[in-house]
Amino acid sequence: MKFFVDSADVAAIAELNALGMVDGVTTNPSLILKSGRNILEVTKEICNLVSGPVSAEVVAAKAEDMIEEGRHLAEIAPNIAVKVPLTWDGLRACKVLSDEGRMVNVTLCFSVNQALLAAKAGATFISPFIGRLDDINLDGMELIADIRQVYDNYDFKTEVLAASVRTPNHVADCARIGADVITAPPAVIKALANHVLTDKGLDMFNADWAKTGQSILLK
């Protein structure tokens, strides 16, 4: 399973990338706002930092305008994935951009039917949102499993990119289900290393080692 970082924080992305943890990056207008950076400048910097796909989102509402924005974003770097919303206009833009050979990430997916349409329109990635479904008492993970099954049934090449990933449990569940990609904030990815028993065991080993009076570095 590939790990994408859901962030426009270049320093945070670089930290994870140095450990080989980054297979790609996703951004959105809210993350660009949080970064305080110009969208074209920060996206180019991220594209230069990582070799995998970097999703940059259009903001237009009409297909023709989405296509124009998408082409402009795609000029930033060859690893740009143009991010479009799962609306009828977004699907029209997806078809045109994908036919032009551009990577397209169709975002804000909340149903299997939407995911089917995105795959038929040539999406490179479909982004179902787990956490936002959980927020309204629906099962976000069930959607991931359903999309995985349907895509496998019909051999769609669109990759399932699980988004709105908020907890380490979300990541583990996506891995078990077979999501192709998860995208998560840096804090969630770093939290994958945490376990209370790891901390407890390390404390015990350190305490016992201190009692030996030894040093590994002294001959």
Swiss-Prot record:
Its EC number is 2.2.1.2. CDD domains: Transaldolase_FSA. GO terms for cellular component: cytoplasm. It is found in: Cytoplasm. It catalyses: D-sedoheptulose 7-phosphate + D-glyceraldehyde 3-phosphate = D-erythrose 4-phosphate + beta-D-fructose 6-phosphate. Pathway: Carbohydrate degradation; pentose phosphate pathway; D-glyceraldehyde 3-phosphate and beta-D-fructose 6-phosphate from D-ribose 5-phosphate and D-xylulose 5-phosphate (non-oxidative stage): step 2/3. Keywords: Cytoplasm, Pentose shunt, Schiff base, Transferase. Transaldolase is important for the balance of metabolites in the pentose-phosphate pathway. PANTHER family: FRUCTOSE-6-PHOSPHATE ALDOLASE 1-RELATED (PTHR10683:SF40), TRANSALDOLASE (PTHR10683). Belongs to the transaldolase family. Type 3B subfamily. This is Probable transaldolase.
